[in-house]
Amino acid sequence: MNPRGLFQDFNPSKFLIYACLLLFSVLLPLRLDGVIQWSYWAVFAPIWLWKLLVLAGASVGAGVWARNPRYRTEGEACVEFKAMLIAVGIHLLLLMFEVLVCDRVERGTHFWLLVFMPLFFVSPVSVAACVWGFRHDRSLELEILCSVNILQFIFIALRLDRIIHWPWLVVFVPLWILMSFLCLVVLYYIVWSLLFLRSLDVVAEQRRTHVTMAICWITIVVPLLIFEVLLVHRLDGHNMFSYISIFVPLWLSLITLMATTFRRKGGNHWWFGIRRDFCQFLLEIFPFLREYGNISYDLHHEDSEDAEETSAPEAPKIAPMFGKKARVVITQSPGKYVPPPPKLNIDMPD
């Protein structure tokens, strides 16, 4: 295990999102099954925490940007700052939708089409953000997710308002199309990992990378698909499973996504105005972490070294012997011990 390599590519933004979604996905089925009787405003607490950190990070980053004009010329600082502003705009629209959902569930006074209105606006904004992101080589997971699901948002809102009376299996047709594409991606990674395993011209590091990617995609997509199928059957009345058991596959997918954030490069350096990698920022604030971060463990390598030391022990080192009169240093070789020659006195004639 190499902690330095583990945290060097850590993406704190995605880790925060997946952690908040995991906690929310635990509280929501507990509330739906009646295990807890909290208000939905409290159930959505992880979502409020997520949005609060986004707004706080953007505010601090904007303040650092405004007070230090010299920072704007550092590499791609301008591009990253614009990407942060786009992300904040999308998060604000999502926050409006989540507030309207809580208000609709608690009071039930307005139509679901009005509740989904922020999502109808976020989709074209996400399309524009995707175009801008492709031009500047930016990460686009959230933007792509919001842009491709516009039809799904419309179907769900119409079904909740009973404008259409389709079964939920039909309502989620856009989602099935998206999941079919993700299944093709999983199949692609599986095939490539098998080809790399059978190839003799590929180094072991590349084989491990492709196998790891295939396993990650399988543990993300397959449980997610199982969760969606169980949820649709529960909404249509084909099964009476508890919501807790239905959400278990989703927890597995989110935990896998959290694990992948430790090996994913990226992340905007302008959140909270840190302007550097999150790992370097933590090491500057907490210097004692460097002692752990500079340690690497390789048990297999240590075992091989122990075997080599056991098979070929090092010859003992013998201290050098010094002559008192001649002041000559005699260093003995690591072979057989040979005594020095006897002292010879030469008498000079008068």
Swiss-Prot record:
Parts of the chain that traverse the membrane: 16-36, 41-61, 81-101, 111-131, 168-188, 211-231, 240-260
Name the record gives this protein: Transmembrane protein 185B
Source taxon at top rank: Eukaryota
Encoding gene (name): TMEM185B
Keywords per UniProt: Membrane, Transmembrane, Transmembrane helix
Pfam families with a match to the protein in the record: Tmemb_185A (PF10269)
Topology class, membrane: Multi-pass membrane protein
InterPro entries xrefs: TM_Fragile-X-F-assoc
Key word Transmembrane helix present: yes
Location within or outside the cell: Membrane
This protein's GO CC annotations: membrane
Protein family (similarity comment): Belongs to the TMEM185 family.
Membrane listed as a keyword: yes
Main location group: membrane
